[in-house]
């Protein structure tokens, strides 16, 4: 590919001859050797995936307004705007849970997941906007005095500064950060601006000092060799190869999403790749713009071209220029695609296809290869394939679109829960809490409640178990973490037990192990039991009189004064009066309680000899409600006890707590439970807790009396695919935009994609655990694997260090058990 390399080496010109920069002349301003002024601002960009076209067009119109301002300032110096969109490879790996406070399964999975995420190309998209003031004319011959030169430069800097300030102001919604100078601990002055320009030359980020020599001699620590259509970069860190793509022709119309396809990896046979996209717009005066449009019209007429629609568009453009709605400018585009010697061609071909799909006519640079490379530098005037376009066209093409990245550190509980990938291969740092990305929120107690909605088969169970597994790192030497999960269909039993947790499946007719009267006889517990017993007896709909309430209170206090081993629900009637009349006896508290005790049909629920439910026994505790959720008699009383135990056993010391309710709307069917959950939803943050509720349908949530309150008190909403989604439920109930709803409804349930929304910002995420077959077998919690796991638990116990090797076949099982697997 580089047959001419020897000749190139022999006749090699110093790269410094092509670098336009001379010196840092003012904070954040570089002057070029020909007198041009350059300043650059980095912006975070703006989300666009679930944003309406109307909103994106309004953004483009604001950008168009600045370009008109820039054109009006070009009466003395010609102004250019150069926009860079950089895609580069990044690596990151989050921490693994504490070895002494988590199970081996958790640590092995999190470590392997973090490693895969880091090793497979993660991409960062960075946006830079540079303003260039091209010196219109050389100094007059009689202006040789240094004072006169300084005065002219001062005037130019003043005008340039005002326009640049307007640029930064126009970018305020994009979180602008002006690139300037900074000092290290030794007082050495470095420059972010020079680091950026040097990156454009070398393809590598490095700190650059403000030198005491001309900038063109200090920058560009790279050797560049050119082939027919490829450049080779050699730096101290290695080699890279680059191909450049230009545009020969453009679509008839532009719109804001036109070039966004370059950000997505649509070819799963190859990894995402780095590139530097450069777009330059040099504003023309109104007269020059009108002349340029008239020239294009004349050329069409001379060619006897039948492009009537093009003529009409040009006429419309002339009217808009004349009315001051747009300006015309010289536009150029280059896309430098990076790769290894083996991959650069495939990467460039992929970009060519994406540009073709967007309606462009792209071409790889050959004769203009070096020009395209140098065109990246703000301040370089030479460029190939210059086209006349409008300021609105440029606003559409250089649209400043980007993706939110979440918040990696300084969250209320520290590091992000998990690093997840977007379809663009960019990292997203997921958190339950929603806090200002720029603020240190460590130790704060903001809202962290999270809703997860998705149709059956969309991956809700896997996502829940993945997040809980990842969250185990929040249990460390300085902090306790308790996870309480109200399960459905035992979907999380394997995951909870693999995390070293406990699991209680409450099944109709089988002793639940719950005996609330064996709680400690504190005043708080006794008062709860009085109220709970009153509600339990009153579930038959008959009136509880003030005298009944007094009798219940006395009976509960009497039972709670006994030794723990004697305390149970069946003892309560001994302290309840039945009345003298037959009618009184038939409707007595004792009779109404009879179905809940001894041989009564519901005695299995609470009349247990020993209480085996202790939420502090395990750091992770799962409770399966599949059976009792369908049983209206016991659903409310059981849930009320469970929530009370969470309040008193787990959350009282304000430890970090995550409460999860799968198909939680069923728990809300009982009014008392709904009230408790509603109160907890509003106050849980003050106790350092998070409520996570999941459901297959928003309709189930919203039909609850307090459904809208649950929506309003969630910081994070995760929407998995739902092809049966109802627009009213999502847009009115959960306050999704129509564009967000459209995405949720259109996603394939097998895509492993989801939409995560925090505040006004939503982002598409893909959670693909296809390379983690073992973890998926546990996270998915299918009926077959759960049944097999339960057989293992009965044989070898619940210790994950023991049962997991059998579960995965690392240890041989008896033949009968092996067949079950």
Indicate where each model-derived feature is located.
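Hydrophobic anchor at the beta1->P-loop junction of P-loop NTPases
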Residues: 452
């Amino acid at each position: 590919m580089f047959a001419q390399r020897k000749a190139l080496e022999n006749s090699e010109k110093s790269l410094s001859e092509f670098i336009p920069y001379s010196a840092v002349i003012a904070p954040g301003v570089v002057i070029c050797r020909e007198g041009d002024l350059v300043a650059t601002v980095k912006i975070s960009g703006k989300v666009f995936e679930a944003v309406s076209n109307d909103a994106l067009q309004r953004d483009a119109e604001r950008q168009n307004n600045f370009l008109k301002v820039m054109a009006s300032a070009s009466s003395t110096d010609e102004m250019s705007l150069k926009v860079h969109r950089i895609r580069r490879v990044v690596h990151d790996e989050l921490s693994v849970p504490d070895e002494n406070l988590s199970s081996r399964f958790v640590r092995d999975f999190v470590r392997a997941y973090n490693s895969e995420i880091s090793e497979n190309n993660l991409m960062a998209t960075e946006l830079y906007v540079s303003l260039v003031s091209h010196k219109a004319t050389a100094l007059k011959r009689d202006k040789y005095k240094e004072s006169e030169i300084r005065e002219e430069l001062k005037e130019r800097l003043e005008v340039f500064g005002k326009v640049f300030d307007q640029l930064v102001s126009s970018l305020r919604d994009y979180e602008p950060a002006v690139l300037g100078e900074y000092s290290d601990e030794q007082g050495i002055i470095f420059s972010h601006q020079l680091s950026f320009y040097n990156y454009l030359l070398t393809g590598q980020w490095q700190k650059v000092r403000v030198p005491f020599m001309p900038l063109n001699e200090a920058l560009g620590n790279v050797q560049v060799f050119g082939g027919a259509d490829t450049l080779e970069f050699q730096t101290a860190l290695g080699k890279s190869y680059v191909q450049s793509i230009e545009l020969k022709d453009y679509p008839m119309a532009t719109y804001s999403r036109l070039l966004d396809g370059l950000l997505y990896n649509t070819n799963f046979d190859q990894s995402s790749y780095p590139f530097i996209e450069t777009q330059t717009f040099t504003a023309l005066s109104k007269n020059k713009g009108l002349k340029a449009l008239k020239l294009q019209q004349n050329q069409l007429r001379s060619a006897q071209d039948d492009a009537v629609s093009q003529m009409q568009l040009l006429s419309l453009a002339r009217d808009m220029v004349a009315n001051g709605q747009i300006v015309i400018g010289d536009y150029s585009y280059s896309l430098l695609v990076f790769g290894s010697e083996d991959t650069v061609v495939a990467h460039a071909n992929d970009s060519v296809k994406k540009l073709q799909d967007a309606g462009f006519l792209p071409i790889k640079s050959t004769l203009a290869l070096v020009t395209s490379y140098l065109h990246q530098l703000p301040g370089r005037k030479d460029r190939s394939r210059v086209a006349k376009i409008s300021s609105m066209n440029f606003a559409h093409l250089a649209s400043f679109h980007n993706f939110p990245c979440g918040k990696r550190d300084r969250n209320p509980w520290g590091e992000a829960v998990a690093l997840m990938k977007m379809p663009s291969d960019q990292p997203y740092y997921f958190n339950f809490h929603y806090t200002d990305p720029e603020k240190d929120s460590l130790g704060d107690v903001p809202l962290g409640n999270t809703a997860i909605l998705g149709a059956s088969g969309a991956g809700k169970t896997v996502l829940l178990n993945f997040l809980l597994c990842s969250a185990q790192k929040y249990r460390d030497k300085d902090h306790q973490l308790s996870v309480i999960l109200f399960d459905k269909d035992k979907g999380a039993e394997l995951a909870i037990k693999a995390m070293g947790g406990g699991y209680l499946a409450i099944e109709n007719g089988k002793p639940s192990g719950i005996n609330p009267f064996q709680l400690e006889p504190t005043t708080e517990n006794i008062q709860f039991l009085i109220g709970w017993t009153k509600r339990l007896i009153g579930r038959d709909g008959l009136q509880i009189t003030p005298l009944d309430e007094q009798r219940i209170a006395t009976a509960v206090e009497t039972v709670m004064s006994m030794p723990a081993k004697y305390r149970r629900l069946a003892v309560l009637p001994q302290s309840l009066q039945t009345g003298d009349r037959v009618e009184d006896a038939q409707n007595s508290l004792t009779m109404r309680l009879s179905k809940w005790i001894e041989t009564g049909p519901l005695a299995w629920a609470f009349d247990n000899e020993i209480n085996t439910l202790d939420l502090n026994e395990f750091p992770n505790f799962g409770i399966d409600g599949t059976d009792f959720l369908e049983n209206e008699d016991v659903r409310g009383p059981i849930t009320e006890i469970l929530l009370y135990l969470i309040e008193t056993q787990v959350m009282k010391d304000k430890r970090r707590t995550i409460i999860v309710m799968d198909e939680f709307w069923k728990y809300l069917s009982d009014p008392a439970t709904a009230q408790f959950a509603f109160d907890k939803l509003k106050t849980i943050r003050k106790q350092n807790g998070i409520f996570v509720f999941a459901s297959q349908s928003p309709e189930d949530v919203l039909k609850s009396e307090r459904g809208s309150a649950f929506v309003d008190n969630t910081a994070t909403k995760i929407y998995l695919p739902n092809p049966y989604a109802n627009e009213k439920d999502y847009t009115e109930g959960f306050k999704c935009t129509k564009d967000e709803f459209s995405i949720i409804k259109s996603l394939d349930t097998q895509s492993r994609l989801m939409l995560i929304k925090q505040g006004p910002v939503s982002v598409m995420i893909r959670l693909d655990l296809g390379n983690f077959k073992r973890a998926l077998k546990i996270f998915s919690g299918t009926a077959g694997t759960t049944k097999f796991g339960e057989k293992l638990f009965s044989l070898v116990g619940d210790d994950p260090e023991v049962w997991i090797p059998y579960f995965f076949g690392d240890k041989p099982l008896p033949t009968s058990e092996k067949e079950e697997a």
